[in-house]
Amino acid sequence: MVFNVYYNGYYVEKKFSKEFLIHIAPDLKNSVDWNGSTRKQLRVLDKRAYRQVLHCNGRYYWPDGTKFVSHPYNKSIRTHSATVKRTDSSHRLKSHVVDKRPRRSLDSPRLDGYVLASSPIPHSDWNEELKLYAQSHGYDDYDDNLEDGEIDERDSLKSLNNHLDDLNVLEKQ
């Protein structure tokens, strides 16, 4: 006979929960269908091991500090409010107001006569478009606007290359 037990092993990996369960209840090692079990449902094959898992409920803690919880899987836990809601038989019928006005579809804007451009139409001169983009986004290349202490990147790379050529150790040997 197979007994299904709910346990809160969904916080950890399945392999760790298996080792943890074997540690707290040694009879589970050969009495559980580990391939058929999940991190929430344990399939116990032996009645003695089933009782042992249920006995461990609330007595042990997972490594993260949460209490070990186990109970029969088919038993549903109901709160008082859930029972009251189910027994309330006064169903109220709602009257639905139907709106007959046409709605604009968000999927196809062209059907309604609206045409949305996905991107702005560029100028006929691409160089002019690139210059405008560079100026508006700070990529413009003005050598005149260097502040005190700034070095032009092209000049600094040239001087670095010249300096590295002077320091070439392999040629001097």
Curated annotation (Swiss-Prot):
Query: What's the domain of life for this entry?
Result: Viruses
Bias type Basic and acidic residues, positions:
85-107
The region called Disordered is annotated at 80-107
Q: What is this protein called?
A: Uncharacterized 20.4 kDa protein in IAP1-SOD intergenic region
Species of provenance: Autographa californica nuclear polyhedrosis virus
According to the entry, what is the taxonomic lineage of the organism? Viruses, Viruses incertae sedis, Naldaviricetes, Lefavirales, Baculoviridae
